[in-house]
Amino acid sequence: MSVPVVTVTDLYHPPEDPGDNVDLIMGYGLDEVDLRAVILDALDEKRHLVDGGVPGYPGPRDPGIVPVTQLNAVYGHNVPFATSPFTRMRTPYDTMTEVPAFQQAGIDLLLDTLQRSDEKVHVLSFGSARPIAVAYNREPELVAAKVARVHLCGGTSTPTYLEWNVLQDPQAMIRLVSTDLPIALYPCATEESCYAHDRHNTFYRLHDMRWIEGMHPALRRYLGYALGRLTRPDYLRVLDEDLPDEVMEPVYARSHDVWETAVWVSVTGRRIVRRPDGTHRIVRGDDVGPGDVEIRNEQLPCRAWPHESGLYSFEPTDEPTPTSVFVRDDPAEYERAMNEATPALFQSFRPPEPWHGDVRTDDREMTR
């Protein structure tokens, strides 16, 4: 049975963090996911930012309409998408009704998707969480009734380091963590940085991206277009053609920082396992074999409370609680496992053949 999902992502075009372009493939490629909508979470200052962000990916940039359209085309889907407010919330209770209509569309889409769903929906936040907080401020009863869980990817395992997603909108984080909504917390950073490891943050690093070469051709080209920062306007036709080595080789050589995989593993009920032969895979729960050893990727019940900075604190509890926090046992072991399991998962994704941008042979003949 598929899991209804709305993903809220600070995905940009050209990329600000190429991890968002990579991560969105999960929503399309995982069979267990019924992707109902994509809400584009943009911030005006990031749109105009030239320096800063991930090295090698300067701005300016705009909301990721292009990559969502590309994946819709590759998979033959029509997942709706819309942008949300470009400015921060002024207070935790801000409804942001005064922003331009174009920027209202993402909040309207989120609320409409919840309203139309006969099942509770998992809402995944890979950004500021502003669209979710504003939607809750506008329609708290609807959100409470229709959200299965908010999966909040952001924050710090100790409230000392101002993590990037929190910085994008502290008021949004304060609002969500203060509610009684069921929330799964996935801290991105430790007290040191967002590139350090501990048991409660989700970060790991892929040593290179050579594995993209083994992906489905359309998905390989999609990532080449994004991670290679191509400016071609024919962003659908580019998916029909292999990109030159001078574009792809620098992409393959990059390391890649990841925070999002733990969320998708949790939402789908998948497991990270070490097989008896020593290989690592991300598998369905019912595909765990008797000789497999599970690599912990779990949610631990906790109490959580926000701070004025937008960061939060948490403590494990045995009491009933709507809140939980990510936990793993050995971050180094986790990273070793994911350096094998994550590439294998992406290489397993197979969009419909031929991909839906292909022109039929008889049509090609007619154009000659």
Give the positions of each predicted feature.
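Metal-dependent C-N hydrolase catalytic cores
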Residues: S2, K46-S117, T317-P322, V327-R368
